Amino acid sequence: MAWSDRAVRADPSDVTGLVRHRCTALWLAAALLAATLLSPATAAAAPQPWNGRYQMITYASQKAGTSPASRQQESDFGAVFTLATQCSGNRCVATVIDGPRPGNPTIPQPTRYAWSGSEWASSYDWLWDCFLGEGNQKQWARATSWASYQPQPDGSLKGTWHTDIAEGACRGSVVMPVAAFPA
């Protein structure tokens, strides 16, 4: 008997059982898919709050990128900041609530970092103050920056600060490692 003959001569009660089995399997798969889609991932739903005092460091001595500014010598810099996290629904935001103001007045304040599911991230538009050498006036240029900090097992956070400078003598990108350590 050929395979096609067996399929044609199937017992009707066997077909009903097979259909019932497949429907049950499909129903269970749909229920599992719905449960997965309706419950957010643990990392996204429950970040470790970023609260308290942190020594935040920008490793400017290690900067890279395509902007001429990325090749200018600069020392690492940092300060102690206090952050507080607030969550609403499935969105958490850590806000800098205390610490020194930036030297550049165009950087939006306060700084806020949103939890993405794996890191704290911030982005903002501002004006880069392009250093053109001793005795020359700085050139202000439109820029967009984003910083990300990934929590580490030791309680610190490490990441990157990336700036795209849109115009002028410093046009290009500047990328620097960043870190935050409990203070």
Residue ranges of model-derived segments:
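Edge beta-strand at a domain terminus
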Residues: 156-183
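A short, structured loop/turn motif at beta-sheet edges
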Residues: 46-53, 84-91, 113-120, 148-157, ...
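Flexible, membrane-facing loop/turn or short amphipathic-helix motifs
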Residues: 61-72, 129-138, 165-174
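Predominantly extracellular/secreted and cell-surface proteins with exposed
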Residues: 71-143
